[in-house]
């Protein structure tokens, strides 16, 4: 996965209350800064990919928008520091001119 220059990418592992997955999926996806949301197997119920401009925006997104959603039990944030793959973001901005 590639990152967008000038943006921070973080991966949030999210644990929710039993029975909350159905309603939290859409709420997480609709949260500003959240680019993708997946339900998962394992210790986390969701993994959310967050892309924001800076650490202040990340802190606001995680602590004020995501962690405060009813049904969220715990979040664990992992900040991406380097990308090794080719992602769709570069192709999205390609206008086809060499």
State each model region's role:
Residues 1-98:
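A compositional/biophysical signature of low hydrophobicity enriched in polar/charged and small residues
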């Amino acid at each position: 996965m590639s990152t967008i220059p000038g943006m921070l990418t973080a991966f949030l592992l999210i644990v929710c209350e039993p029975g909350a997955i159905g309603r939290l999926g859409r709420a997480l996806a609709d949260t500003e800064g959240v680019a993708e949301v997946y339900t998962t197997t394992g210790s986390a119920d969701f993994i959310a990919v967050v892309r924001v401009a800076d650490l202040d925006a990340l802190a606001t997104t995680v602590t004020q928008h995501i962690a405060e959603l009813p049904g969220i039990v715990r979040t664990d944030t992992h900040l991406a520091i380097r990308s090794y793959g080719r992602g769709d973001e570069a192709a999205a901005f390609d206008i086809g001119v060499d």
